[in-house]
Regions:
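Active-site neighborhoods and metal-handling regions in enzymes and metal-associated proteins
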Residues: 1-401
Length: 401
């Protein structure tokens, strides 16, 4: 009822939005908690069309507001015909950017152009602002994920220091095992475990059993998981095997400065993500570095969600209650790269009316050996100490471990 009015309907094919709107999960596709479906939402009822053979829990079969209907291939058309006969529909909304050609054919066959109404982000804008219950669930998921990542880094470094042969594939496997041991159902995307020069590849995805961790290698871990509540986690940390070179400390510290500046921003309601993006890039740009990706994306049922964006092109405001990433990086081809990613919650500032700030959900300490403290301003040093104290309380600070 927050999205559509009387005699209106909304056709949805975006699986994460369907899963969020009806608060159901299926884990039907790799690295996702969604279920396969199409959906028509009315003001007080949702009709969910699912492929035959997909199990539906008994408690959902007699739900007062959700009606699950099994359909064969092409069966969506017949369900739309039935919908048209049984309900007075003056307008049916759909997303022009995501509807498939097949689904649009069905819609345009049943509804004329006057009724069929393209409209973007009707669900995404509502889903972006998390409820108090959802925020609690996110905090619970990240508390588990933080421990899994911290344990992985400790395990890998311990094995390396004990002179074990630890490969990129071992690094990958160790990460996924630690998530599973902590109660994760699956990963929220394929784990990125990059060793040495592979850390300079932004979305590295081919861990090798032949790439053995060596002294001086940068190790980049970008990973996430789903727990029972079905919301995604996503965090990146970069650390070092052995002792770092000066160039490694420089790029790590510049990335850290950008993360600290962005994460500690205080900004007016209505501020666009582009303003925060500039804060993250400025420290490295002063020394000639930059990165070819956005600084932040939303997170929800999927690891990437609309409604929250931090990039040079972000032209929408950051809203209270939204959750997303801050993830600056520097990547030097054939040498190595650094990315640091925290997931944050946008909250009203506790002291300043009309202002917002970020609260980190990711609480995993930074690599002390890679920080050049002389490069940090006094303000950034305070920011770092405050963040490490949060991590220390969760047992996830390398500074105090």
């Amino acid at each position: 009822s927050k999205i559509i009015g009387d005699n209106e309907a909304l056709f949805l094919s975006q699986l994460d939005q369907i899963s969020w709107l009806v608060n159901c999960r299926g884990f039907h596709l790799p690295y996702q908690s969604i279920f396969l479906a199409r959906m028509v939402a009315l003001k007080e009822q949702a009709l969910i069309f699912v492929p035959e053979g997909i199990p539906i829990e008994p408690k959902l079969q007699n739900h007062p507001f959700l009606t699950f209907i099994y359909v064969k291939s092409g069966g969506t058309l017949q369900q739309l015909v039935t919908l048209r006969k049984n309900h007075q529909i003056d307008r049916i909304f759909y997303s022009k950017s995501s509807v498939t050609a097949e689904d649009y054919h069905y819609l345009s066959t049943v509804f004329n152009e006057r009724i069929l109404t393209p409209q973007e982000n009707m669900v995404a804008d509502v889903a972006a602002k998390k409820s108090e219950t959802e925020i609690v669930l996110f905090k619970e998921a990240f508390a588990r994920a933080n421990q899994a990542i911290f344990k992985t880094i400790k395990d890998v470094i311990r094995r390396f220091e004990c002179e074990e042969r630890v490969s990129e594939q071992d690094f990958y496997n160790q990460t996924n095992t630690n998530y599973s041991d902590g109660g994760a159902i699956t990963q929220s995307f394929k784990t990125i475990s990059a060793v040495g020069k592979n850390s300079s590849i932004i979305h590295f995805g081919q861990p090798s059993s032949k790439n053995i961790i060596s002294d001086g290698d940068l190790l980049l871990l970008d990973s996430g998981a789903y727990y029972k509540n079905g919301f995604a986690t996503d965090t990146t940390r970069t650390f070092i095997a052995g002792e770092p070179a000066p160039w490694q400390r420089e790029i790590y510290t510049l990335v850290l400065k950008g993360l600290l500046q962005a994460q500690n921003a205080v900004f007016p309601v209505g501020t666009w993500g582009a303003s925060i993006d500039a804060l993250a890039r400025t420290p490295m740009q002063r020394l000639g570095y930059d990165y070819a990706h956005g600084t932040g994306h939303g997170i929800g049922v999927n690891a990437h969600e609309a409604g929250y964006s931090i990039s040079p092109k972000s032209n929408r405001p950051l809203v209270e209650g939204s959750i997303g990433s801050i993830e600056p990086g520097i990547y030097l081809p054939q040498k190595g790269g650094v990315r640091l990613e925290n997931i944050v919650l946008v909250e009203a500032h506790p002291k300043f009316s009309g202002m917002l700030h970020f609260v980190p959900l990711t609480c995993i300490g930074f690599e002390p050996k890679l920080i050049d403290y002389k490069m940090l301003t006094s303000e950034e040093q305070v920011m770092l100490v405050d963040y490490e104290e949060l991590c220390r309380k969760q047992g996830t600070s390398f500074t105090w471990s």
